[in-house]
Regions:
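Non-catalytic interaction-recognition regions
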Residues: 1-229
Length: 229
């Protein structure tokens, strides 16, 4: 009855056929893998506000949106509070914060330091213009580029199919590709480990693209993108 009333209101306001009802499945609340027992008769229950107060709005929103509306959600309270890579929301947010840290370090490289390390233009202000992306030939760099190129089509499919959970899967895959890239490829010069200036700029540009993409995806699902963690 309520849905019918809302549909009539939408029709009257000039939006015929625009009202959609998407029903989600049950959420199984767990703590350390064990079900949290609730009972209407006994009055024992956990409200959404209580859940958000305990785990935080980012963890709650990300976990609930990370499944298709056709799937039940197993929400383990202790698991989503963990600050390690086993927690998907932490994993993605940490990747964003790590990229921001790299870009801050690049901005702190002075001209004198850059010259000493065999670099001429490493600072963040030097990236973005006239970058030679053809220098990115490492398999991890290519995998990262391919993943970044999926975003536009992904957003369109999420909107078309009412499937925002795909954004969380994409973010986790992108975070994984970034960590693999950063482990395999030196981005900034260090003492005794110079990097070709143009290659460094290209890698910094790739890092910045990851930052922008992760921030956009997290914003789309209503989750913050911290610059420090």
């Amino acid at each position: 009855m309520l849905f019918r009333s809302v549909r009539c209101v939408c029709d009257a306001l000039g939006y015929p056929g625009k009202f959609e009802v998407l029903l989600g499945q049950l959420v199984n609340l767990l703590r350390n893998g064990k079900p949290v027992r609730m009972s209407k008769r006994k009055g024992t229950m956990v409200t959404l506000q209580e859940l958000v107060d305990e785990v935080g709005s980012d963890a709650a929103r990300y976990t609930l949106i990370s499944k298709s509306s056709n799937q039940m959600v197993d929400f383990d309270i202790e698991a989503v509070k963990k600050r390690d890579n086993s927690n998907p929301v932490y994993y993605v947010q940490y990747a964003h914060a790590r990229v921001c840290s790299i870009l801050r370090r690049a901005a702190d490289v002075t001209a004198e330091q850059a010259d000493e390390m065999g670099m001429k233009a490493v600072a963040a202000k030097a990236i973005g213009e006239n970058v030679d992306y053809s220098l990115l030939t490492d398999p991890t760099e290519l995998a990262l580029s391919r993943k970044l190129n999926e975003l536009t089509d992904l957003i369109a499919s999420c909107a078309r199919d009412r499937a925002p959970f795909r954004l969380t899967h994409f973010a986790e895959e992108l975070a994984g590709d970034f960590h693999s890239f950063y482990a395999a490829c030196q981005v900034l010069p260090s003492e005794g480990r110079p990097v070709d200036p143009e290659l460094s700029r290209a890698r910094l540009a790739a890092c910045d693209a990851v930052r922008v993409t992760l921030a956009l995806v997290l914003t789309l699902v209503g989750v913050s993108a911290p610059e420090q963690m």
